[in-house]
Amino acid sequence: SCSLVGSEMCIRDSHNIELEHPDYIQIHPTTLYSSKPGRRFLISESVRGEGAVLLNGKGERFTDELQPRDVVAAAIFNEMEKENSNHVWLSLAPIDEEVIQNHFPNIYEHCLEEGYDVTKEPIPVVPAQHYFMGGVKVNMKSKTTMNNLYAAGETSCNGVHGANRLASNSLLESLVFAKRAVNDMDFD
């Protein structure tokens, strides 16, 4: 049955609409580790851009936090495997407390709700699925292989991202390809 997550795949299957690059899945390196079920809370890479560092269980830095997402995620997975752990640690200690509370209020508050004060202690983080660059195959006007069906945004694969999307590019992609779809539609 179709669901809210991945429903485009269910629709695609039931109508034989072509799929492209189902293996193009972006993993975000830092989501808050929690034993609670449900979606993970994303810890923005801008926190690492401000100076937060990744630490292993011994409190040692193990990678350059400013590398591309896939490289940082791979380093985290490697460290977790080496330590037989289900997370690594992200320390915001290098960032001034006022900067944390003013620039990252949602992260600060959510971590407090989970029992972590990011101004006083590192938080457990783990990579998680973040964005799907594959999807329903479309042309440059967002037209699918099914007559009169268009797709734009994360549900479609138009090829602009390749296998690793850059941060924030998906918003522009969604707007551009939605406009292209509307411009191509015949409303008569």
Per-region residue spans from a language model:
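Short beta-alpha connecting loops at secondary-structure transitions
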Residues: 35-40, 160-170
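Short FAD-binding loop at a beta-strand-to-alpha-helix junction that anchors the flavin cofactor
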Residues: 143-166
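Short, well-ordered amphipathic alpha-helical segments that serve as non-catalytic structural scaffolds
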Residues: 8, 106-107, 177, 181
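An anion/pyrophosphate-binding glycine-rich loop and adjacent beta-alpha core
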Residues: 15-123, 184
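FAD/FMN-dependent oxidoreductases across multiple families
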Residues: 105-149
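Single conserved hydrophobic/aromatic residue that forms the stacking wall/gate
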Residues: 1-6, 10-11
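Internal hydrophobic alpha-helix adjacent to the cofactor/substrate pocket in enzyme cavities
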Residues: 15-18, 148-149, 174-188
